[in-house]
Amino acid sequence: MMALYGKKDQEEHDTLDPIFGSLDEEQDLPKYQLNETPVEPRIAYQVIKDQLLDEGNARLNLATFCQTYMEPEATKLMSETLEKNAIDKSEYPRTAEIENRCVNMIASLWHASPDESYLGTSTVGSSEACMLGGMAMKFAWRNRAEKLGLDIKAKKPNLVISSGYQICWKKFCTYWDIEMRTVPMDMQHQSLDMERVMDYVDEYTIGIVGIMGITYTGRYDDIKKLDALVEEYNKHTDYKVYIHVDAASGGLYTPFMEPDIEWDFKLKNVVSINASGHKYGLVYPGIGWVLWRDKSFLPEELIFKVSYLGGEIPTMAINFSRSASQIIGQYYNFVRYGYKGFHEIHKRTHDVAVYLAKEIEKLGLFEIINDGSQLPIVCYKQKDDVKCKWTLYDLADRLAMTGWQVPAYPLPANLEDVEVQRIVVRGDFGMGMAHAF
């Protein structure tokens, strides 16, 4: 998430210290303005490296879903392709073909039908992928509604989603003037409440978002049940509603670990899916993917033809120029690991998560909210009947003193009084690190 910075964020000491023994030893470098003259490359390198010395260790950051390790060969390939602009497909046709292969591999994992014209694209991350999926839903809804004679200006269009949504959906609804209808979570329904979700749907609903890996807890929405509810609803109305699956976390994990779960394009009313390659696709940030089951669900007006890079290039993106290196990194992982390799990595991750959940539960202080048996996320709260003089926020601070970053936070709307702590187990977090933790 990009933060906003300005004058108020400047530090009181506004110069950088020079490097001992260098020719520039007496030259202070300003922090917030350009220096007047160049410095030697090694000076610039060392000054900046020194600024980063006291940052947290990314491997010990159990707050983030983002991948923090890749093999040296992958890193080498990515560093060798940093200068390639992914959007310039006529200049880099082999890179474009690699992106095409990745889309088709993911489509196969998500059971896209060869009888439908599925299509997809890479993105900067799942946030952009969600934006694209949301825009496609909005434009497709508008086209259908206008054909049916609905006054689309009479009310705001709306999007239905669990209150456990990731912040990108709030951004989407704000940026594109959509009413966000959130279905409250409770301790009984720690995912999308299937008993209530359809109460939020009407003729102005652009779509329903199901989540495969709720950010707060790691739980899955029951997409198969949601599909059945939508199917029944659509039988009795001309104003059809469809499902987008936000599988930022689960999209490149579930197919390898629980292939029998029905959540993807196997289900008739799931029309688009997004996933993060930089989560359980095992690539450094940032890379995401969004796919549609058929081109009929991606309105033509959202596809732009760009000719000024040489050749006419169709593009569906919010971002434009970006490095192709992350696409290359994703393809490396697909080639390197294959289906069995991804399964083995995720199985080890699963085993670590389950181990941690059991060990934390043995302490007798915590109630496990999510035990890592599906998505490898361990989430817990303090037991109501155990009196402690400390909070989960105190525990997070104490863990931070030893280098571990483990966030504590309240659950979303309707459960704000419940404070939890969450451990994200990634592919680079082995059993040895779990024992050390």
Predicted regions mapped to residue ranges:
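PLP-dependent enzyme catalytic core of the Aspartate aminotransferase-like
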Residues: Y233, L415-F437
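Short Gly/Ser/Thr- and Asp/Glu-enriched loop/turn motifs at secondary-structure junctions
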Residues: E116-S117, A154, N370-I377, E416-V420
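Structured alpha-helical segments in the cores of large, soluble enzyme domains
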Residues: E99-I106, Y165-K170, D193-V201, N319, ...
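Surface-exposed helix-capping loop/turn segments at secondary-structure junctions
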Residues: S108-S117, N143-G149, I360-I369
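Active-site C-terminal subdomain of aminotransferase-like
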Residues: F256-L375, K381-V386
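N-terminal entrance/gating region of PLP-dependent enzymes' catalytic architecture
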Residues: M1-S117, G403-V406, Q421
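Conserved PLP-enzyme active-site core in the AAT-like
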Residues: G6, Q10-D17, T121, G125-E301, ...
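Conserved PLP-binding catalytic core of the aspartate aminotransferase-like
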Residues: F366-G403, G427, M431
